[in-house]
């Protein structure tokens, strides 16, 4: 009886953990909010003044890309954090 209860609890905990990981909601990020979330995702900090990130943002902004950019993927339509992470260090 005890083994059955422990197995049941274990199955419930594992299924709750798995379902919470799968339910990341795609959101839209535009303007300052997009800049802040990118700074947080890429550098692990909240962006305040932005001066310390100027070279990064200028380089990213000035680089011409033929494929869709972060604004296309995360402002014009919802995206998940994994998509934002793919723009770190670009």
Swiss-Prot record:
This is Bombyxin B-9. It comes from Bombyx mori (Silk moth). Belongs to the insulin family. The keyword Ribonucleoprotein does not apply. GO terms for molecular function: growth factor activity; hormone activity; insulin-like growth factor receptor binding. Coiled coil: none annotated. Residues 49-64 form a propeptide. Brain peptide responsible for activation of prothoracic glands to produce ecdysone in insects.
């Amino acid at each position: 009886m005890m083994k059955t209860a422990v197995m049941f609890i274990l199955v419930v905990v594992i299924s709750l953990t798995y379902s919470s990981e799968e339910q990341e909601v795609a959101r839209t990020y535009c303007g300052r909010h997009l800049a802040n979330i990118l700074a947080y995702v890429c550098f692990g900090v909240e962006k305040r003044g932005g001066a310390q990130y100027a070279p990064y943002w200028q380089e990213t902004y000035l680089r011409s890309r033929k494929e869709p950019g972060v604004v296309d993927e995360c402002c014009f339509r919802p995206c998940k954090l994994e998509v934002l992470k793919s723009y770190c260090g670009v």
